[in-house]
Amino acid sequence: MRYVINHDLHIHTKLSSCSQHPQQTPENILRYALDNGFKTVCVTDHYWDETVPGASGWYAPQNTAHIRQSLPLPQVEGVRFLFGCETDLDRHCTLGVSPARFDELDFVIIPTTHLHMTDLTVRGDETAEERAALWVKRLDAVLSMDLPFHKVGIAHPACGLIAPSRKMYLQTLRLLPEEEMERLFTKAASLGCGIELNASDFGFPEEETEIVLRPFIVAKRCGCQFYCGSDSHEPDEFTGVMQRFARAVDLLGLTEDDKFLLR
């Protein structure tokens, strides 16, 4: 059976510093879920646990008290509205969420491809070769942690933020070693974490299809399961999301067996 698009597990509210849109509220996110027939949605604002050293000046205000301002989330019959976060991984591969905090979150999204945060995640002057090596190193670091992987999502593996230009971005994806991707995604599949189908990752032109899909094709071949994430920061970004998700499902030939289920 074809993969059914019935969820969105990566949504920001106005509490995320990169959003701050007054209409990006839990109530409007719930309306978006109802309008699209979703059974599960999850709020995932940017978060750095204040008990973990190393937060950048941008991340530091986005602490526990800050993201918990969304609670309690509005609930209606037929829709699971969950409370999660999108954290980060610094240059030393320190995760921005402490082990104890996982119990307070329904879902934790970990982006290993935020290679645009100078000083926090990168120096800023890395070559494509170095960025490809970081892609491998950072995912490897996360998969080597002692985490409750049944509620962990690996965000946007083909994120445009991997490099400062489209040319370098595509070059970086080409440089990802096939054998390393196979090793990492085989491990991810065995651990049971989800791999994100981020709507923004699937807006590429046709001529880029082969290169952008590389990580996803390997992940599928290795038995990984996938979840949909709009990564929306404001209401207008909900427009076209279903078409992007459908494109991902069709290009990868996903079925219900390929779906990550957040229990």
Spans of model-derived segments:
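Residue-level recognition of the N-termini of beta-strands and the immediately preceding loop/turn
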Residues: 79, 151-153, 257-259
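Divalent metal-binding pocket/active-site signature
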Residues: 22, 48, 110-206
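A metal-dependent hydrolase metal-coordination microenvironment
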Residues: 2-137, 237
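Flexible glycine/acidic-rich beta-alpha junction loops that bind and position SAM and/or redox cofactors
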Residues: 51-53, 156-158, 162-163, 235-237, ...
